[in-house]
Amino acid sequence: MNNKRYDRFYPGKVWLDTEGKRIQAHGGSIIYTNGKYYLYGENKEKTLPGSEVWHWGVRLYSSDDLYNWTDEGIIFKPSHDEKSPVHFSQYLDRPHIIFNEKTGKYVMWIKVMKKEKMCDQIIVVAVADNITDEFKMISAKTILGLSSGDFDLTVDAETKRAYIYFDKVHDYKTNCGDYTRQHTHIVCAPLNDDYTDVLGTYTEHLETRGGTYGREAPSFFERNGKKYLFTSATTGYFPNPTECAVCDTYDGEWKNIGTVHINDTENTSFRSQISSVFKHPFKKDLYIAVADRWLVNLPDNFPDNFYDILRSRDDPDRVQLMPNEEIDKIMECNKPCNRNTSIADYVYLPIEFDGDKPVIKWHGEWKIEDYE
């Protein structure tokens, strides 16, 4: 048993549960329900370099204070059937859970990239009566005829209509004849009344040229009537700058308002990627950016402008800022055979606001109790 009781957040440091084990809730989200906080995410405990294991299901933790987490077990189990879309070798990422007041069900959506062809990305939907129950898969399919990438879910507090935001993914054939993924839009689509499928309509937003200019990993939140989306660039597990877009409606004209990690000299979102935003239910204006530090072994001399260096290689209209061999050397830790995501850390930081613009500053440690 871990006798240490946390009384604050330590972003980027090893975070243990109440049994003294690393917390395994990557690509995670927090939900407050039934008088408790619940943290859930990808269980990466078996995802070691050289293994065929991408995920070991979705793990859930409970807490009374957001600092100390008790393991509630695996609520969505991996399959051992190689034909299953949720076989442990399939690229299952970023689960999101919403509660349906009408049906009384908790509904989990999960993105799955098929390992045979990563451009083929589907959505798995599973349901449970209680958040601590095992979620049962009810569908696994392409939605809206699109290959859907990272996503987020939200429920309108008044109408109870739910929406999904996801990055639209395309096949792209390179000059070498290989196929790669291009992320060109963020899609918004309303869900049906029981939150188990889309209605069939959608809108496209925040168009990009793709490549490292593409945006993924949308994280949605609301404040003072405005809707916000944090998005990440498409550099794999390699960290890059988070951008923010704002809109007055769910499917209106989204406007990019720039990067948010304002004192981040490396331009890497403090070496992390945001997976969700949690509004504290008992604080006036406390929003928490929930993020993973996927690569814990980046070099100390990591170039401050490395994202621009990557983009210069991706853009034929720009002068390349670093030779390919030097770029490849830095990117070595991002190769699948070298990634050990079982030891990925977490970077949970408070979101501040400059007027209506969200900003995130670095805190080596911080406490919820310091906020009204």
Where in this protein do the model-derived segments appear?
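Carbohydrate-active catalytic/glycan-binding domains of CAZyme proteins
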Residues: 1-372
